[in-house]
């Protein structure tokens, strides 16, 4: 017998999108920097390496935690951590551990280009990250180099995928 779904008693209190659907997912950018220069996202000829921003302009971990806690209070249950490349954010596993400890946040995911994942996959998993999305445009090494602005290698991403699998993702 199939279980009968029960409506969320607080659904009427939730913020809604333009189509009236409750907002339960939050996408949060934790850094405005990337180690690649993909032509569709941040071409080297138009985006400086520092993006015109410095570390002082980023939200602190305390500010991020307070912000996410507020969204959880109004019904957000899923968090996707992004950035240009979120793995460039120093001490990211520490931030994820803080967010994973928030009551009511059921899922934390991260989108990455995967090039820095080999060194961080285990720490991210142990911190409480549930899921990963790795953006991979091609499995051709030369095509990959061209798409990343020659700032990344396919081998780095593949090592990151292996490390993620070994870490339990």
Annotate each language-model stretch with its function.
Residues 7-9, 45, 88:
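Intrinsically disordered, low-complexity segments enriched in proline/serine/threonine
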Residues 32, 84-85:
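Acidic-residue sensor for enzyme active/binding pockets
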Residues 1-24:
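Auxiliary Fe-S-binding modules of radical SAM enzymes
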């Amino acid at each position: 017998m199939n279980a009968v779904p029960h409506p969320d008693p607080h659904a009427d209190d939730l913020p809604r999108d333009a189509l009236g659907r409750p907002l339960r997912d939050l996408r949060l950018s934790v850094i405005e920097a990337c180690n690649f220069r993909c032509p569709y996202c941040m071409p080297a000829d138009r985006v400086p390496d520092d993006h015109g921003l410095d570390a002082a302009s980023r939200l602190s971990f305390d500010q991020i935690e307070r912000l996410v806690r507020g969204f959880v209070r109004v019904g957000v249950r899923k968090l996707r951590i992004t950035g240009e490349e979120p793995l460039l954010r120093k001490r990211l596993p520490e931030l994820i551990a803080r967010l994973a400890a928030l009551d009511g946040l059921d899922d934390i995911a991260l989108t990455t280009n995967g090039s820095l994942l080999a060194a961080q996959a285990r720490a991210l998993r142990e911190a409480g990250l549930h899921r990963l999305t790795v953006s991979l445009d091609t499995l051709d090494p030369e095509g990959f180099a061209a798409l990343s602005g020659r700032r990344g290698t396919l081998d780095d991403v593949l090592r990151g995928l292996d490390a993620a699998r070994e870490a339990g993702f």
